[in-house]
């Protein structure tokens, strides 16, 4: 709709003899005065050496004399010192509502289809999943769904950390405890990793032995490979169970180990392009740029003992992905604290002509904190395992209301998912946020349960009315008009979320849509409406409202329960 308004204003302005290539239309921050605003008068007045007030009044006068004024506008006024205030017509609003009913995707930005590889999830094998893993999984899954919805092809890869020092530590523990391979289970892994990690922090000799085991594993030691495969199998089962609960899925379950097949080729490329330098026996790549405002150290590709590092495997993984998928973009949904690491990797990739840096995107996310502003802990003071967090959220939700105890497990799980996911995705991806389960599980306020409640409330009305609805050109009151205009903001929210890789635009939108829908519902008694045209119009608007709420929830990885 903004595009229509922009084109009309541009045509009128150009017909007056002024040259303006693009007219900027923005949503009004004073909806009591107007729907949209144009702030280009100052720029245009400066370019044409005109008084902005005189110019603005001239343009608005011409708009009001436009032959199709009533088709597009209800009211267009000039506000000093240089703003054009626009109220759009019922005809224009309803025209776009009909497009949404037919296919809401028609209002989205259209781009040539591209292929995106999305790297998210990425837990380290043999470690229990904790609250921090929830963020990468949920944010990554949502971004994947948004990109798919925009018409692009996505390839998702969990990229497990399955070949690092933690594996050497666990293998050391297995050998020390003289376990048979069949005795390695998730209970043992949950116990042995933190135990060995603590020992290695205190005992340098054991730490070096674990590093040696890791190196031999990477070099192909058969016994260590046998134990590693069992550890990987057990750990993946647990990871999949947690990700299944979150409705997070991957096309590929590759790991760091898969990149080892490409390390020699990657090293060869770096050497052929004279990019590697020796530094105390190690191989490094200088990635510093003259324009850098902070120190960017060299990428350490290979240690002096011949061992490879995360930077080596991440670079080799880019090579692997270019060969396997030939993607247009590779996206990495990882902790903000990894930014320097990926800057080094991306710059090396570009210098080596593996993949240009502009096609590699670092999508950092902030941490999940408790009310004290520190990383979130359980009531007992521990960093919560993801499974324990699910159970804690269930307990809190069920305790909120007596009827919640009688809900099916499937419905409870869907609501718990909405609590966790909406809490996460309604916050700006790059920011830390305070995780408050009591607040996030309320049915009021900016929460997942509030969105679900609104949908089910509307759905109850719609299910009682089996009608093939058509829309008249009437709009009956301000809550009605506000809801219709809110429906038309949908495409902006999706376009912004896609462009910025920021799901919170969708979370913000669907919350505001639900607020408008509830105000509309409170002010308009639909079921008691005797005027059939009016009643049908309102049912039509509510049908569109639920259509968009449902689609937003899908993009936010939230399923709808049968009852609340």
Regions found by a protein language model. Give the residues of each.
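Short, charged, solvent-exposed linker or helix-capping segments at domain edges/interfaces
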Residues: 95-101
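Flexible, low-complexity linker/hinge segments
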Residues: 101-111
